[in-house]
């Protein structure tokens, strides 16, 4: 409405309903989404700053969520990319060596190279590093988490295995199929087998290097083997209890502000919610009242 009044003042009587419709269409298609995105970014940075003040750390957030960049609600799918690793490495370089780093992760995974770069940079930082997982950090996200001095997860959050994927297939499954079928396979399959062997060996060694200082040689080798050898499917949820069973130390005290930050990454506007609830915390008295 404000836009229509503004345009009417500018254009005067010469403005037709078609002109108004055109300007409104341009506004909704390009200008409004950009304005909302800038507003959300400002709120995110403010929330990050509050977490930094509370914890005395440099906070870096890598949150991959579907976001709609137009009023049509077209979702943009996100995962760990080289651009992410460039930005995180830059943020770490801008952080004093004696300042702790909190890396907040919410991701399905992504490129192995980018994840490895982030993991190495995190491990090499001299002050304490913490990875905070409010919901999930699968695949490459799990690899990054293993590099931190401390992992903080929501009690219902999950990580995942870091076994290599060759194209659309797990490297461990390619090897399993080869061992069952024997030598009577195509040249292409033999090439995939060779790549799979190398990929598993490389990832196992990489995870071991991340863990050995924290857990010691024997335990680090055991955890690395378990996470990279295809023990589970790639999307298998490693819960807090499962991680502790593997010997990985996990803290479940996620700062409340981290959840508030995650809420500033809304799902696409065009998507109809399938979950409904009253979005306020209930007190114990309210619980007792409802029970009656």
Swiss-Prot record:
To M.jannaschii MJ0137. This is Uncharacterized protein MJ1495. Keywords: Membrane, Transmembrane, Transmembrane helix. It is found in: Membrane. Its main location: membrane. GO terms for cellular component: membrane. It is a single-pass membrane protein. It comes from Methanocaldococcus jannaschii (strain ATCC 43067 / DSM 2661 / JAL-1 / JCM 10045 / NBRC 100440).
């Amino acid at each position: 409405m404000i836009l229509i009044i503004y345009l009417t003042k500018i254009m005067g009587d010469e403005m037709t309903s078609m002109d108004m419709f055109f300007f409104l269409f341009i506004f909704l298609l390009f200008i409004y989404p950009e304005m909302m995105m800038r507003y959300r970014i400002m709120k995110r940075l403010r929330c990050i700053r509050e977490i930094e003040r509370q914890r005395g750390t440099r906070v870096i957030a890598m949150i991959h969520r579907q976001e709609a960049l137009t009023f049509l609600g077209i979702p943009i799918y996100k995962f760990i990319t080289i651009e992410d690793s460039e930005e995180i490495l830059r943020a770490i370089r801008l952080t004093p060596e004696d300042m702790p780093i909190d890396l907040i992760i919410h991701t399905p995974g992504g490129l192995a190279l980018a994840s490895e770069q982030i993991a190495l940079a995190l491990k090499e930082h001299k002050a304490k590093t913490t990875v905070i997982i409010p919901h999930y950090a699968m695949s490459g996200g799990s690899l990054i988490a293993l590099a931190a001095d401390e992992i903080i997860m929501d009690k219902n959050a999950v990580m995942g295995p870091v076994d290599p994927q060759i194209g659309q297939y797990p490297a461990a499954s390619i090897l399993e199929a080869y061992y069952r079928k024997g030598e009577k396979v195509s040249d292409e399959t033999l090439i995939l087998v060779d790549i799979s062997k190398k990929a598993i060996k490389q990832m196992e060694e990489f995870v071991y290097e991340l863990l050995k200082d924290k857990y010691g040689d024997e335990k680090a080798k055991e955890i690395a083997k378990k996470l990279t050898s295809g023990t589970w499917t790639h999307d298998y949820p490693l819960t807090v209890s499962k991680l502790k069973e593997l010997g990985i130390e996990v803290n479940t005290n996620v700062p409340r502000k981290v959840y508030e930050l995650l809420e500033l990454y809304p799902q696409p506007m065009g998507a109809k919610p399938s979950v409904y609830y009253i979005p306020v915390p209930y007190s114990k008295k309210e619980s007792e009242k409802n029970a009656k």
